[in-house]
Regions:
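Acidic-histidine catalytic/liganding microenvironments
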Residues: 14, 46, 96, 148, ...
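Charged active-site motifs of nucleotide-sugar-dependent glycosyltransferases
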Residues: 52-53, 170, 330, 425
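AMP-binding/adenylate-forming domain of the ANL superfamily
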Residues: 1-101, 106-131, 146, 153, ...
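AMP-dependent adenylate-forming
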Residues: 1-4, 87, 95, 101-121, ...
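Structural motif
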Residues: 55-57, 101-103, 223, 250, ...
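Alpha-helical elements of Rossmann-like donor-binding domains used by nucleotide-donor carbohydrate transfer enzymes
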Residues: 6-9, 31, 38, 42, ...
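Motif- and composition-driven signal specific to adenylation
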Residues: 63-69, 76-92, 117-322, 330-339, ...
Length: 485
């Protein structure tokens, strides 16, 4: 069965099974099947043969799922747009996407309540399934096209590797639907007859309500960014009694610190912890590894794993030549999970995508190296700076800070003036709050770092926070931190 057939299968054999929980609202598989079919019929009637995508403006409402499936059942890709985005950003996305129709949760609820027997013409394997917008270096968002074939290749790998139990799993949905990490929990859940448990931004902003919701969630598969888990670990009761059924933690989207894994394994001893890596352009995740005690002891920083079957990951130099193991270069991904390119931007597509050994390939802009058959992610190429003539990897300093037992989390940023880098600043979340002044603690950390790094890589300023600000996608908001310098 293909993905849409899998989801509709649960609507037939288990129509009362809950597919989605968002706050006080639920959506069953039977309702999802009937309403998405009705919406698909409506879209076919309204839009006709036009193949432009359907934009869906919302947050975590059940109607989002109805809209996604309704769009692809009508033969059109969907563009999820979270209402938390600034209006200017939403306007930019709509201008680039040029959707045939923009749906809201209210409109979707109204239209999908009307039954229909219209034959469906769903998207085919090579057709766009969804389009996600990511940040562009020019400030203009880029629409990444993911086909049904890309998504199903990713999904088949996930289902085979993780062995999710049918009809008994509850997946945590932390990331907004406009962020590709959500694709992991959304479609792994729908394909296996699971329940998707959404965490709204209101819960994230109110820890008391968040932990109450988690206690009542019955989550078995936790999917989030590492930053979100680190925020939860601040709460002392975030332990196995709060999530007694959790079987696995799946992390993607950011670097996973070893300290975070160690704390999770101590608090949730029966759960597995997985580290995964992949850009939006390669359909959510391309590599994975289970972080057991042996991996935790052997590697720091942690590896992001081995590639999925049917996909190659190679490291190339500036000339595009493949490098041998252990050498650092740009990560290139080639295979069936790679996007056909950016919506309406053949120029950007030509720069980032190419053919490698007969497969579509993508230049990630990420640095890494291969060691022991494992991929190690070593930060963005554009996170390199020059200070006093020295080329510095900010991620290198962060990794060394995170290796200190006093440090729970760390971000290092350049202090600039008129475009020139003057010095470095380290934002730090301490493992335990010190009695000494921030100045004294900062000097102590600088001294410890000085035992590991050359003097030109040592931050001049240390700023201490209880927790880092996060973007709507659940990643550390580096822009907000930089604005405070």
């Amino acid at each position: 069965m293909n993905l849409l057939e899998r989801v509709d299968h649960w609507g037939t054999v288990a129509p009362n099974k809950i597919a989605h929980v968002s706050g006080e609202r639920t959506l069953s598989y039977g309702e999802l099947r009937a309403r998405s079919n009705a919406l698909a019929a409506y879209l076919s009637g309204q839009v006709g043969d036009e193949c432009a995508p359907i934009a869906m403006l919302g947050h975590r409402e059940p109607e989002m799922l109805v809209a996604f499936l309704g769009a692809v059942k009508s033969g059109r890709a969907y563009v999820p747009i979270d209402t938390a985005l600034p209006q200017q950003r939403i306007d930019n996305i709509l201008a680039i996407a040029r959707p045939a129709l923009v749906l809201t949760a209210q409109e979707t609820a109204r239209v999908s309540a009307q039954g229909s027997e219209t034959p469906l013409r769903p998207v085919q394997k090579n057709d766009p399934f969804y389009i996600l917008f990511t940040s562009g270096s020019t400030g203009e968002p880029k629409g990444v096209i993911i086909t049904r074939g890309c998504l199903e290749h990713f999904l088949n790998w996930m289902l085979g590797e993780q062995k999710f139990a049918e009809r008994t799993e509850t997946f945590l949905n932390q990331a907004p639907f406009s962020f590709d990490l959500s694709v992991m929990d959304l479609y792994c859940s729908l394909a296996t007859g699971g329940t998707l448990f959404s965490i709204s931004r209101d819960l994230v902003e109110n820890p008391k309500l968040l932990y109450r919701a988690l206690t009542n969630s019955n989550v078995t598969t936790w999917v989030s960014t590492p930053s979100f888990a680190q925020m939860c670990l601040i709460e002392e009761t975030f332990r196995e009694p709060m999530l007694p059924h959790v079987r696995r933690f799946l992390f993607c989207g950011e670097t996973l610190p070893p300290q975070t894994v160690a704390r999770l394994r101590e608090r949730f001893p029966r759960a597995e912890v997985w580290n995964m890596y992949g850009p939006t352009e390669a359909t959510v995740a391309t590599t994975s590894i289970r972080i057991d005690d042996d991996v935790l002891k052997k590697y720091s920083p942690l590896p992001v794993g081995r590639p999925m079957p049917g996909v190659q990951v190679v490291i190339v130099d500036l000339a595009g030549e493949v490098l041998p193991p252990e050498q650092r270069g740009e990560i290139v991904i080639a295979g069936q999970n790679v996007s056909p390119g950016y919506l309406g931007r053949p120029d950007l597509t030509g720069q980032a995508f190419f053919e490698f050994e007969g497969e579509r390939a993508y230049r990630t802009g990420d640095q890494g190296r291969l060691r022991d058959g494992l991929l190690f992610f070593e930060g963005r190429i554009d996170h390199q700076i020059k200070l006093s003539g020295y080329r510095i990897e900010l991620g290198d300093i962060e990794t060394n800070l995170l290796s200190l037992p006093q440090v729970r989390d760390a971000v290092v940023l350049p202090v600039t003036k008129n475009g020139a880098v003057l010095s470095l600043a380290a934002f730090v979340v301490l493992s335990a709050r010190e009695q000494a002044s921030d100045f004294v603690v900062g000097q102590a950390l600088r001294k410890l770092l000085g035992q590991r790094l050359p003097v030109y890589m040592l931050p001049r300023k240390f700023l201490f926070l209880d927790a880092f600000p996060m973007t709507p996608n659940g990643k550390v908001d580096r822009a907000r931190l930089a604005a405070s310098l």
